[in-house]
Amino acid sequence: MVKPTRGLYTIGTIAALGVLAACGTSSTTTSSNGATGIAGCKGTITVATDLPLTGGDATDGPFPQLAAQLAVNQAISAKLMGGCTLKYISKDDSTVLKNGHDPAQGAANITALASDSTVMGVVGPFNSSVALAEIPVASTNHLALISPSNTNPCLTAVVAVCSDPTININTASLYPGAHTYFRVIASDVQQGEIDANIAAKVLNATKVYLIDDQEAYGRGLALLFKKYYTADGGTIVGQTSLPGSTTTFSTQISLAKSEGAQAIFFGGTTGNGCGLVRRDMGSAGFNVPLLGGDGCQDTKFISDANSGAKTTEAEGSYATSAPDVTKLASSAQFFSQYAAAYSSKAAPYNDGTKEPCTAYGYDAMNILLKAIQATLTANGGQPLASPQAFRDAVVAQLRTTSYDGALGHTTFDANGDTTNTGFTLYKVTSGSWVGVHTYAVDTSGNVTVKS
């Protein structure tokens, strides 16, 4: 294998020659490119997404999926793979049974994609619980995964919460083969500390009640919040772990109220009840702040919270999520191109700014595409004869990523984690999530305001 070099990729390189019309969310896009860019490349190269597109997650997954497909369409238009045919497949890891993301479906999707020898990488999954099921399959099959949104730290590194009996994640066992997993978003080690700092110093809450949804992401985030919040002198007055199928939280709200909680922290997703907690807080007349992580920051939270007697209950709710890249100069071109490509889509999918991870899906796919292109270039402009060797070479290129895109500058550390970190605090204001400040944790472990 030729030793990969560190290339500097820019958003303009991939966006050249405009945008093609998008296809549906559960679809395949194919185009045969002319013999330019990589002279004489022959064969088919496939990339894919695996994201939750239906059910309770329908307000989340379609955004990074559409963004990733936009990146593929631009690559096809720019003939990024030269004479090779670039093909795109979209997979939905939601099921009717789960009314949203389903780890078993995710694993089945990756198994199916891995069985196709032309598939060189996948953008996804969206949820950490799905990642736990997918990573071992991808590892065994040498297939690159790049998540736009997974934040559970145990997916890539061993931290204290991994051994908690309710989480019990053996990080090493996730990789029976090659380490092929990467993510373009920071982990909950940072998010938990930032959330704790916000609860104590922005919301001025000295007592907090915790609720989590029993999943890898939500439970892990709640435990990290607890660790940092109590270390700062805060008191956890109660903690409840409930399954994602829970539809009423009145008992927990009553407990929090009776214990004098000055805020509630929810570790989990909107699909697993985050907005319903806010709804039930309103019904109980419990008017303290609700704070959640990135799993709560979507339009479904607002509609769920406002579905009770008080139709403005979502107002004033807080959540930390992916940095508000709409304020970055580096993202302006992407959001303009997204709007042009999907102007005919029904709201809210016609506006990429409505979901924080939209741009993350775009950069993740562009990073994958550039890694494949670099692999072809290093092999004389042709796919490697062995599909496994081709996949291994793509993963090797991903490890050397140095990419300037919508998110700014992205590189990966030895664990596959992005070095471009931070989380934005959002607040529901006049019916929409509005970014307040972006925070990061410095090398000394202190929470700082980035913007």
Language-model regions, residue ranges each:
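Bacterial N-terminal signal peptides that target proteins for export
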Residues: M1-G12
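Beta-alpha junction/loop-to-helix N-cap segments that form part of ligand/metal-binding clefts
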Residues: P4, T29-T36, T59-P64, A78-I169, ...
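C-terminal motif of bacterial Sec signal peptides marking the signal peptidase cleavage site
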Residues: V19-A22
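Bacterial signal peptide processing site
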Residues: G24-S26
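Extracytoplasmic "Venus flytrap"
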Residues: A35-Q69, A75, K91-P103, F126-N127, ...
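Extracytoplasmic ligand/sensor domains, especially the bilobed periplasmic-binding protein
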Residues: V119-T240, P289-A319
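Extracellular/periplasmic periplasmic-binding protein-like sensory domains
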Residues: R278-Y362, A374-L376
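Segments of small-molecule ligand-sensing domains
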Residues: S343-T358, L369-V436, V449-K450
